[in-house]
Amino acid sequence: MASAQKSNPGNYFEDFHVGMDIVHATPQTLTEGDIALYRAMAGNRFAQYSSAEFARAAGLPGLAIDPLHAFHVVFGKSVPDISLNAVANLGYADGRFFLPVMPGDTLNTVSKVIGIKENSNGKTGVVWVRTTGTNQRAEPVMSFVRWVMVNKYEMDNPAPEAVVPDLPAAVPASELSGFPDMKTWDMALSGSPYTYDDYAVGEKINHVDGMTVEEAEHQIATRLYQNTAKVHFDAHGQKDSRFGKRLIYGGVVISIARSLAFNGLANAGQMLAINAGSHVSPLFAGDTIYAWSEVLDKATLSDTCGALRLRLVAVKDQDPGAFAYKSDDGKYAGGVLLDFDYWAAIPKR
């Protein structure tokens, strides 16, 4: 007697429809152990995510989870339902961090499908979802939109009516939340004398340092977030893929590039919003990540705190001081891995 399949094959493009609500399994409680592992794997050096005493003096309740760390956990919860059969995660928009995530907090994740469009090849389609992470008190701690290219189950299945969501180019500075009172910020302990007043729109910052990513560590990082995407783990299964080997989770690139940005942006450690993001090209074990940033905008949030809108560009195996980005035809330059636009809090003088 044949039994019904009890394992999860993941959703294909045909399984999604606009308005679909998905409750993702396995809430995750984050601890100080998670903070230590994240620091070990991403190299995070920002003072408010390294020292409990500094964090309290800087207006946080204590040693908090880095917002990107929490983002990866919430993202990871959505993978089995959204992107287990994905070809690629294409981009991010309208990401907002509402509350700090503290050790002992438990993150739950839900998503709503807000857009869908079959690709012209008839083999894949793009699905847009808004994913929200809440804590154990059902308080939203973050929300973001991402879109992913997903395989169809059958190429001959009819295409659904296309719905493409209208997304903001950036989170308005007036809607940023969760920023601290930074009047007692200690420049000596933070590692930089530069504040909001020292950065100019259009300024580019070479973050100088590089970090080579190895096979084992990127898998440990991805498992930390309980991200189960096949392309990151199954070496045997990926032999017949487009690249013939495992891909490094794009979140690893974001976190390492962000950690490298400490050298030049040490006082801008708290991410307030994700405006946009694209994984431009793949990263593989043995590649080295470098990064540079451009100041896109500035905004005053309070008497003690400002925000910098930053474009973080990660490049592979090349000098970040060349500021590789796009050519005259609008195409990304060779070696560009990541184009990530975000707001960060920074103390004012």
Regions found by a protein language model. Name each.
Residues Y38, Y92, L107-S111, V127, ...:
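Short, structured motif recognition centered on aromatic/hydrophobic residues
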Residues A2-V18, V101-F179, T184, A285, ...:
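HotDog/MaoC-like acyl-thioester-processing domains
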Residues A88-L99, V113-G115, Q270-S281, L296:
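A cross-kingdom feature marking solvent-exposed beta-strand/loop segments within repeated
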Residues A2-L90, K152-V171, L176, P180-I274, ...:
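Hot-dog-fold acyl-thioester-processing enzymes
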